[in-house]
Design a protein with these regions (language model features):
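Intrinsically disordered, low-complexity Pro/Gly/Ser/Thr-rich segments with frequent PxxP/GP/PP motifs
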Residues: 86, 91-122
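Beta-strand elements of well-folded, non-transmembrane domains
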Residues: 40-42, 117-121, 134-140
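Short, solvent-exposed loop/turn segments enriched in Ser/Thr/Gly
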Residues: 28-39, 109-112, 122-134
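Primarily extracellular surface-attachment and macromolecule-engagement regions
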Residues: 13-24, 68-70, 81, 124, ...
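Short, polar/proline-rich extracytoplasmic segments that appear immediately after membrane translocation
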Residues: 1-13, 126, 132-142
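Beta-sheet-dominated interaction scaffolds and their linkers
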Residues: 2-46, 55-58
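Surface-exposed interaction patch
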Residues: 32-87
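Low-complexity, Ser/Thr/Pro-rich intrinsically disordered linker/stalk segments at domain junctions
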Residues: 23-25, 52-63, 92-105
Length: 142
């Protein structure tokens, strides 16, 4: 059982790790927004919140941008995370997003993770330099 990022709120398409954003060389630095959904549905197919995730240290569950290939061109500060689209305006690039002290399983308990990418890299190509990390957690029966 594992919470995963999905590209849709119903949890039918697992996030592949690539955001479909394009930056054009004549217009770099323009923010592009998207939404991912963080949820667990494998052990809770009836969507009744049977399980909960808690941070191992007793604090909040954190989702953090990570640099998968340091020095490769993209920096974690290019990614802002928020739980709402309007929250992206005041979010700090590269900062962790707190998802609260616990999350419950099931599609109806999906957490929207709004993502804003602002990059000045203008080299054409697909970049897989950046990803997401989560702090250590435990899964418990609800």
């Amino acid at each position: 059982m594992t919470w995963k990022l999905y590209t849709d709120p119903a949890g039918t398409q697992v996030f592949s790790g690539t955001l479909p954003f394009a930056t054009y060389s004549d217009n770099p630095g323009v923010p592009q927004d998207g939404v991912l959904y963080y949820l667990e549905k494998e052990l809770d197919p009836v969507d009744n919140g049977s399980y909960r995730m808690v941070a191992a240290d007793g604090g909040n569950i954190l989702l953090t941008p990570s640099d998968l290939n340091p020095g490769s061109g993209h920096e974690i500060t290019e990614i802002k995370l928020a739980t709402s689209a309007t929250g992206l305006d005041s979010a700090t690039g590269g900062a962790s997003l707190s998802l609260g002290p616990q999350l419950y399983s099931g599609v109806s308990n999906a957490v929207a993770v709004h993502v804003r990418v602002t990059t000045s890299v203008v080299t054409p190509g697909v970049s897989v330099d950046l990803g997401f990390d989560k702090n250590e957690t435990h899964i418990l029966a609800a």
